[in-house]
Amino acid sequence: ADGLGLAKDWQLSFQEPASPLMEELINFHSIVFWVITALTIFVFLLLAYVCYKFSAKKNKVPSKTTHNSVLEVAWTLIPVLILVVIAIPSFRLLYKQNDFSNIDMTIKATGYTWYWGYEYPDHDDITFDAIMLTDEELAEGQPRMLSTDNMLVLPVKKNIKVLITSDPAGVIHSWSVPSLGVKMDAVP
């Protein structure tokens, strides 16, 4: 689809997902967002309550309580349980991102200074470079800073393994396709 994976003006959310993995990442993000929002509101309300109830005006004689075992166990176990509930789907997604058991094709992406080199090792070792177009080279409607002279073409509905590396004499590069839920750094 033309324009798939492009951000829109004033966009505050994720790009449209183009893979099942990205759909799961968006769902996980939504769940964690609401959990964190609820926790933040709870902590804020608890803090406001404690500040009000135990202020110097309301509490002329301060409490001499040194500890409360039940409360201490609760404020240790509840956060641990919340983290476990968040960690389980997170680990499942991390595993899915690195599951290479059913691969249809392999692509090798090599980061160079200001461009990427691509290889199709499974298909006659086809290689090419994708160099970003200058403003003068852009055609009408091509996105600035995203258009290259050669595009990486991938088949639809296939599991593709991308081997990401960097020129040994180069710098760290970031290979990313947000609509597929992929971002990987290439370190020399």
PLM-predicted stretches and their roles:
Residues 2-31, 51-188:
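Non-transmembrane, membrane-proximal soluble domains of secreted or membrane proteins
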Residues 40-54:
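Alpha-helical transmembrane segments
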